[in-house]
Amino acid sequence: MTMSDTTDSTAFDSGHFRTIMGHFPTGVTVVTAMSPDIDGTGPQPVGFTIGSFTSVSLDPPLVGFLPQVGSSTMDGIEASSSFCVNVLSDQQSDICWRFAKSGVDGARFSDVDWHAAPSGSPILDRAVAWIDCSVEAIHTMGDHLFVLGRVGALDADADHDGEPPVPLLFFKGSLGGFEAAG
């Protein structure tokens, strides 16, 4: 069954839906890419904050995320045919908010240290982990896209200056860290 096979028999406020979904904690990622040279200034880094990231398959290794339809950042990712998912640490809430705002992608990267993944996509320094992918498929799902990526390379930062990294989480409209007990 597909979305087009169903009839929307449940009408409710989208704000209420968002509030209820906010009770489910999610990890915070910044998805990045190097947008191809489209204006003669050379490839440009693009990226946005994504909370809807998930693993999809182990064999083959696939991941997915859901950006909003109409995102100019997504246009750059689609044009590059690759992306890197950066799992943010609890010390990177400023980066989360910076990349969550609409605007010029280049400004998002000012004063943010990064280096290139094998695909050329930016790996943000001090991220908990990064996953470099090629775009496998893109599907429209309501007001969002589902982007499926095939994992080409990945790694985790096992040590932030002698301390294990703590991932950043989003829960009920706020950001915080998570440390496993034991």
Task: List each model region and its residues.
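Basic, polyanion-binding surface patches
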Residues: 2-182
